[in-house]
């Protein structure tokens, strides 16, 4: 692709981020970082990089699970079968990401909308399941510690059902 085609793709990405009201940085031309707001996962850190032939997107979803990694990874792989444009991946530390690429020729305002929407939806919808599968012991300890001290359990409410069942 030419410099003009890469610049055009970067312009479309920039306009899409602005259109969605997202605060973003552009540390280098064609490299964007933004935080996508969610409900279950309050923010998803996301980067978009205009490359030689494609637009790459990568979003941090969760750190390396403390336990039950095989079940977490199996769930992610099964989930990948239903995802659009991105897939779950793990880095060398075991941290979980959504990662994808589209050809520069496919970079349009509608496709940027779909891409950002996919990342936001998949990160948000998957977050609690990843936590339940990969961090259950830590969540249970935190829950019990807060209850014993009369502390708020507000940010653990999504897990109340299985936390209140016997261990």
Question: Across the structure, where does each feature detected by a protein language model lie?
Answer:
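N-terminal catalytic cores of peptidoglycan-degrading enzymes
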Residues: 1-67
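Short, internal acidic amphipathic alpha-helical interface segments
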Residues: 58-99
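Short amphipathic alpha-helical segments
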Residues: 5-12, 68-72, 111, 115, ...
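Conserved short hydrophobic interaction patches
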Residues: 16, 20, 75, 79-83, ...
